A protein has these predicted regions:
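A cross-family phosphate/adenosyl-ligand binding-site feature
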Residues: 1-64, 71-135
């Protein structure tokens, strides 16, 4: 990504913190967004650069797009997904079960829908339907 953009990445919590005060982003995409990351977002924990970037960005009342990839979306992570879906400025890339036979609680985002999700989120809309057919 650094080669494509010509910009240095953000690799520390301290480097992520100015995202908010400086208004550096229009939108933030977290892809993939694991169950652990969603749990920490829901709990307000900022112990990684990604989580600090999200917290700092949300100070500006701007959208955060989550692209879920978790083996327990229909288990322990479900409460966090529900909480985040009901929280202002969080938008989800539509997702579905990736292997309902071997991993019945697992769901992953339809990543090909990230661009459409970004467009919708920038207009304050959640791309629908959020839960889609299995892969």
């Amino acid at each position: 990504i650094q080669e494509i953009t010509g910009e240095r990445g953000i690799f520390s919590i301290q480097e992520a913190e100015p995202i908010g005060p400086k208004g550096l982003l229009d939108i933030l995409v977290i892809a993939p967004c694991t169950g652990n990351t969603m749990a920490k977002l829901a709990a307000g924990i900022t112990d990684t650069p990604v989580l600090m970037a999200a917290k700092a960005h949300m100070r500006n009342d701007k959208p955060v797009v989550l692209s879920p990839a978790t083996n327990d979306a229909l288990g322990a992570s479900l409460k966090n997904i529900g909480f985040l879906m009901n929280t202002k400025n969080f938008y989800f890339v539509p997702f579905g079960q990736d292997d309902c036979e071997k991993k019945p609680k697992s769901m992953i985002a339809h990543t090909e829908l990230i661009p459409d999700t970004i467009e919708a989120a920038l207009c304050g809309r959640q791309l629908q339907p959020v839960i889609r057919s299995p892969f």
